[in-house]
């Protein structure tokens, strides 16, 4: 076991809040492997970079010799985490939860060392609960305590319904820490109430309470709202090397440093040296390129990272059209407006986005900037269509019989 002040500082780096810091330092000074727990409800099949902030911190604990428990909340996912919700979440089927859980395991081992990771499912102990067990667990806390939680309080004061089972969610998540005898639990800042519930329940059941370490919610590509698939401002870890590389290169320099701080495997000292080099004249674009290659290599490999970099240079810095660009075919009865066409071939998410991109001067057809979203491209021809810097398609428009 490595126990040094520098190690403690590195483990705490990037955390938004640690409760309480002295207890973490005391646990680390014991010089024995600690049980580090992080729970994930498999409510969606794919992870994005926002999820990996937590996974990166778990990886750090592994590197310093601690035992990491990757907890899949297959039982609690069927209830639905009410955190941040103003309506009751619809529960998922067991089949959906288990299918999502399989993909989670495949994805997380791109970051975590499988030989140093214990994968647990909370159904292993929660399925054994009977009515008496559940009532005893519910009796450990009051409704008043539950209403201290912001989202519950807002729903209560505005007359929005709160289902009884939603009060059970934080209790069941907290009980996971009892079952696993966790020393430390990691989670996002939005999980603070649930994480502290683990501490309270461990005390109730006679165990030493866990330390809670909260990581920040990372901003999406827009630099404003948190990274989310529903907001389409995310970088998925299962995306292609070109997509990951291109999306990272599209972010602002300010957001780049935020991503590097939370997502790079570089140490705090190495990152500080990078920042200093930029202050001394290094182009931040070069730092961004190196970071983009690091992330692509993590989820693919180094060769793919170099290829993605080369393709990016060819496509965007030199303005070249990739030779291997696949041609799409669109068969229509009569010409359609460009705004509708862009959505139909998935270059935009909606017609309104198409109109906005055209008005911003971000749409080109065969290299010419288009200003009219109602423009209709003639049938029987092929076109190179570009939206912004990263979206490009070769399209053949054909006449329907």
Curated annotation (Swiss-Prot):
PROSITE patterns, sorted: AA_TRNA_LIGASE_I, S4
Q: Give residue numbers for sequence motif 'HIGH' region.
A: 42-51
Q: Name one GO molecular function term.
A: RNA binding
Write out the residue ranges of the motif 'KMSKS' region: 226-230
Q: What class of enzyme is it?
A: ligase
Tell me if Nucleotidyltransferase is a UniProt keyword of this record: no
Entry binding sites for ATP: 229
Q: Name one Pfam family in it.
A: tRNA-synt_1b
Record gene name: tyrS
Its signal peptide is: none
Residue ranges occupied by any S4 RNA-binding domain in the UniProt entry: 336-397
Q: What is its main location?
A: cytoplasm
Record-level GO BP terms: tyrosyl-tRNA aminoacylation
Keywords attached to this Swiss-Prot or TrEMBL record, sorted alphabetically, are: Aminoacyl-tRNA synthetase, ATP-binding, Cytoplasm, Ligase, Nucleotide-binding, Protein biosynthesis, RNA-binding
Q: Which CDD domains match?
A: S4, TyrRS_core
Q: Which reaction does it catalyse?
A: tRNA(Tyr) + L-tyrosine + ATP = L-tyrosyl-tRNA(Tyr) + AMP + diphosphate + H(+)
Descriptive protein name: Tyrosine--tRNA ligase
Entry function? Catalyzes the attachment of tyrosine to tRNA(Tyr) in a two-step reaction: tyrosine is first activated by ATP to form Tyr-AMP and then transferred to the acceptor end of tRNA(Tyr).
Its cellular-component GO annotations read:
cytosol
Its family remark reads: Belongs to the class-I aminoacyl-tRNA synthetase family. TyrS type 2 subfamily.
Which compartments is it annotated to reside in?
A: Cytoplasm
What HAMAP family is this protein classified in? Tyr_tRNA_synth_type2 (MF_02007)
What EC number(s) does the entry state?
6.1.1.1
